[in-house]
């Protein structure tokens, strides 16, 4: 189920407290926040629970959540069977 339209997109209050300096701190803990147009072209670091993942925000990412771009689980690698 998607979010109700009347509520609008969720953006963590942390982004509103910043003083407009885009280069001072680009680390984002809030994976649940929606990517807004003001982030286009900026490189941000998203925390996946283990390390910081650096991602450059592009126009296609608007409307998605930050957490979609920093995976929290390790990809499985299947070993080849030897005969």
UniProtKB/Swiss-Prot annotation:
What Gene Ontology biological process does one annotation of this record name?
A: translation
Which Gene Ontology molecular-function terms are recorded?
Answer: RNA binding; structural constituent of ribosome
UniProt keyword annotations, A-Z: Mitochondrion, Ribonucleoprotein, Ribosomal protein
List the subcellular locations: Mitochondrion
InterPro entries from the entry? Ribosomal_uS19, Ribosomal_uS19_bac-type, Ribosomal_uS19_CS, Ribosomal_uS19_SF
GO CC field = mitochondrial small ribosomal subunit
**Keyword match Ribonucleoprotein:** yes
Per the UniProt entry, the disulfide pairs are none
Q: Which HAMAP family match?
A: Ribosomal_uS19 (MF_00531)
Family according to the record = Belongs to the universal ribosomal protein uS19 family.
According to UniProt, the name of this protein is Small ribosomal subunit protein uS19m
Organism encoding this protein: Tetraselmis subcordiformis
- Gene name of this polypeptide: RPS19
């Amino acid at each position: 189920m998607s979010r109700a339209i009347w509520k609008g997109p969720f953006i963590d209050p942390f982004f509103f407290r910043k003083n407009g300096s885009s280069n001072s701190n680009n680390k984002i803990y809030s994976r649940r926040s929606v990517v807004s147009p003001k982030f286009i072209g900026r490189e941000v670091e998203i925390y996946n629970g283990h390390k910081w993942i650096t991602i450059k925000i592009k126009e296609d990412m608007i409307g998605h959540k930050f957490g979609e771009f920093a995976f929290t689980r390790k990809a499985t690698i299947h070993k080849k069977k030897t005969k």
